[in-house]
Design a protein with these regions (language model features):
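Hydrophobic packing and interface segments
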Residues: 1-661
Length: 661
């Protein structure tokens, strides 16, 4: 078994090499005219400036965390925290860098070579992000597992990797979400409603910040989010297996992730081969093909590693993989088709009915995914105990390379459309980029649903590992009873935290958008000839406002998420902490689903009207839908996504400190 420990990090290094090769392929395509390059450079520079400033804040926070971890839990756990933070930061940075290089090339290919080449470039840009997430997880986590020699006692320090990755993910998701939505809301309200100019119009001072936001929120933020769930699922499975002293089950999550990476690379090749088909068909073919390949190889892997126990474990893996697909499809329904048409129709009677209908859709959309998650939990636990929950989460996330690639494709296509509009590349080019963007909106909605389901399952697996670790350290059972006041107190505290964090992040977007709106209004008023197209806006000022606002307001949610488990655990005991995690999980998952789906439905209702339905642009119905979309933006891209990471941060911090309770 020891000779197998080196395989996962080697697979991860191979995946990084493939990502590098794809990056060089992207660079070979034409970057466009000088005007296109200038716009792309502004987006790239704005994104990288934000990342540098964000990571400088993160460096201070993570350094303090590493020192505290070293003092409380020793060197090995501190090393793991450092590795997790570096890996998560690298995944976000590399994905952002490559996405901002692919956007102008996608727009240029749409103008000169057509939809097929444009799809390939946009997808390649997303693939780099996907492969970096999967590969860095294997290199970091697999490398630590190899370093600790697969020993159950020392391998528990790996839990620190999840804490480091989670902290980076939370700051990236919250900071990126505040940035992107303050820019988006400001640009939309002043540009579309007040000035009456189209989206991505070069006269709008907030348009570059809006395009930068697509990258910092939906590429770097989403990448860190998925990375943290991906690693969290593996860590939880390893931790549960460690309490059983079962080295085979400890190594299995890393082995499954390794074949998941290979399956993802094959899925990327399938998308390339199918690129002559419609974009949505090509992307679905790659996703399904990758999942089928993974499930088949996983069957033989589990049999060879676990013998007669392998079948039940494989069925748990299958349950997680199928559950992830189902949650994505349910999300697609609620953010498209009839629910969206109902919201758009309600706009005929004003913005109030748009808000009411959208909230109703969001609330209804929570029910079926929760039932799917409950089914996964019941089936996987029945098959192979608490370990089944962790391994089901691994099954859902193993093909993260292709899943994240398709999700990151969306912002690249969106940016390409923005560049085409700002550079005046013509109606035909815009039609191609719009068709790619439309598919990107669908994949983004599915990706958000998948991310919520994955985060929920990963968090539950980590909570299960927390319970097993406490029981193991106490030499007996650790049971959380609803009749125990300590557990109930913890549950009420836990369920209140998602509402507090949502309030903080929504308020942050509102405050930042207020600053952005005032700046855009000032420029329209004070720069002569700007609205007529005879002068250039000061886009850098808007980027700076969004950056400063995001960095100032991202710290408080992060501090609350990290400190709450320690305060409850050391103040009220392990029972209250277990209750807090249970309450927090239910609150976070419900809030995340409602906000993501309501926001996505509002967004697509606006786009449905903009296609010419119900009178099209410029009507009162359209204005009402824009209000819904504006409220939905921080729902689906700031507060909703922060719930995924919030519960995982609380769970992994609880698991790390469990030996001290």
């Amino acid at each position: 078994m020891n000779s197998m420990l080196i395989i996962p990090p080697l697979f991860g290094m191979a995946g990084l090499l493939v990502a590098l090769l794809i990056y060089f392929v992207v660079l070979k395509y034409d970057g466009g005219t000088d005007k296109v390059k200038k716009i792309a450079d502004q987006i790239h520079l704005g994104a990288m400036v934000f990342m540098r400033r964000e990571y400088s804040y993160l460096f201070i926070f993570v350094t303090v965390l590493i020192i505290l971890t070293y003092l409380a839990l020793g060197l090995n756990t501190a090393i793991a925290v450092t590795a997790g933070a570096i890996s998560s930061s690298l995944a976000g940075w590399l994905g952002m860098f490559s996405a901002t290089k692919a956007n102008s090339r996608t727009a240029t290919a749409a103008a000169n070579q057509g939809a097929k080449t444009a799809l390939s470039i946009a997808f390649y840009g997303g693939s780099i992000m996907g492969l970096c997430v999967a590969s860095l997880g294997l290199v970091g986590l697999g490398g630590l597992y190899f370093y600790f020699g697969g020993d159950p006692d020392t391998a528990r320090a790996i839990e620190g990797f999840g804490m480091g990755a989670s902290c980076v993910a939370l700051f990236s998701r919250v900071g990126g979400g505040i940035f992107t939505k303050s820019a988006d809301v400001g640009a939309d309200l002043v540009g579309k409603i007040e000035a009456g100019i189209p989206e991505d119009d070069p006269r709008n001072p907030g348009v570059i910040a809006d395009n930068v936001g697509d990258n910092v929120g939906d590429v770097a933020g989403m990448g860190s989010d998925i990375f943290e769930s991906y690693c969290g699922a593996m860590i939880a499975s390893i931790a549960i297996a460690a309490t059983l002293d079962d080295s085979g089950r400890m190594l299995l999550p890393l082995a499954l992730a390794s074949i998941g990476l290979i399956s993802s690379i094959l899925g990327i090749l399938i998308v390339k081969a199918a690129s002559s088909l419609d974009a949505d068909v090509a992307l679905r073919t790659g996703t399904i093909g990758s999942a089928v390949i993974f499930i088949i190889i996983a069957f033989f892997l589990t049999q060879s590693m676990l013998g007669e126990d392998g079948l039940n474990v494989w069925l748990a893996v299958l349950t997680g993989a199928v559950g992830g697909v189902l949650i994505g499809l349910i999300t697609e329904y609620y953010t498209g088709s009839k629910p969206v048409e109902d919201i758009a129709k309600s706009g005929e009677t004003g913005s109030a009915t748009v808000m009411i209908t959208g909230l109703a859709v969001g609330m209804q959309s929570v029910v079926i995914p929760i039932l799917v998650l409950a089914s996964i939990i019941w089936i996987s636990t029945y098959l192979t105990g608490l370990y089944g929950v962790g391994i089901a989460a691994v099954g859902m996330l193993a093909t993260v390379g292709i899943t994240m690639a398709i999700d990151a494709y969306g912002p690249v296509a969106d940016n390409a459309g923005g560049i085409a509009e700002m550079a005046g590349m013509g109606e035909e080019t815009r039609k191609i980029t719009d068709s790619l963007d439309e598919v990107g909106n669908s994949t983004a909605a599915i990706g958000k649903g998948f991310a919520i389901g994955a985060a929920a399952l990963a968090a539950l697996a980590i909570i299960a590992a927390f319970v097993e670790t406490i029981a193991h350290s106490r030499g007996g059972e650790f049971v959380l009873l609803l009749s125990d006041p300590k557990v109930l107190v913890g549950m009420f505290i836990g369920i209140s935290i998602p509402f507090l964090i949502s309030s903080i992040t929504m308020t942050a977007v509102g405050d930042a958008a207020f600053e952005m709106i005032n700046e855009i209004r000032r420029q329209f008023k004070e720069i002569p000839g700007l609205l007529e197209g005879n002068a250039e806006p000061d886009t850098a000022k808007c980027v700076d406002i969004a950056t400063s606002a995001a960095l100032k307001r991202m710290l408080l949610p992060g501090i609350i998420a990290v400190s709450a488990p320690a305060v409850v655990g050391f103040g009220l005991g392990a029972e209250s902490l277990g209750g807090m995690l249970g309450g927090g999980l239910i609150g976070c998952v419900s809030m995340a689903l409602m906000m993501a789906n309501a926001g996505g439905a509002w967004d697509n209702a606006k786009k449905y009207i903009e296609k010419g339905n119900l009178g099209g642009k410029g009507t009162d119905t359209h204005a009402a839908a824009v209000v819904g979309d504006t409220v939905g933006d921080p729902f689906k891209d700031t507060s909703g996504p922060s719930m995924n990471i919030l519960i995982n941060v609380m769970a992994i911090v609880s698991l790390v400190i469990s030996p001290l309770l």
